[in-house]
Amino acid sequence: MPRSLKKGPFVDQHLFVKVARENEKGTKNVIKTWSRRSMIIPDMLGHTIAVHDGRKHIPVFVTESMVGHKLGEFAPTRTFRGHVKDDRKGKRR
C-alpha cells in the first residue's frame, strides 16, 4: 500500500541535512548513507549518494526518473551467481 499523500515523502533527517548542506554550498560530493528507506526527492537531483547494501556502499547518481523511488531500490543486497551446471559424466555408476 502506498504512503498517504498528506504525509509527504519520508527522508531520514540526517540525509536531508547533508543534501541541503551540499545544495547550499553548491558542491556535488558523494554523500554516504545507510538509509535505504529514504525516498528520493527533487532536492537530490544531480547528487551521487553512496547507498549501503549490507557489505559496501554502492554509488547511485540521482536522475529525474528516480524521483519518488526509494534509495534501496538502486543498491541490490543479494548477489546471484547462477545455478551450478550438472556434470553428467561424474554421475555414471
Swiss-Prot record:
Belongs to the universal ribosomal protein uS19 family. One of its GO terms (biological process) is translation. The keyword RNA-binding applies. The gene is rpsS. Keywords: Ribonucleoprotein, Ribosomal protein, RNA-binding, rRNA-binding. Protein S19 forms a complex with S13 that binds strongly to the 16S ribosomal RNA. One of its GO terms (cellular component) is small ribosomal subunit. Pfam families: Ribosomal_S19. GO terms for molecular function: rRNA binding; structural constituent of ribosome. SUPFAM superfamilies: Ribosomal protein S19. The keyword Ribonucleoprotein applies. This is Small ribosomal subunit protein uS19. It comes from the Bacteria.
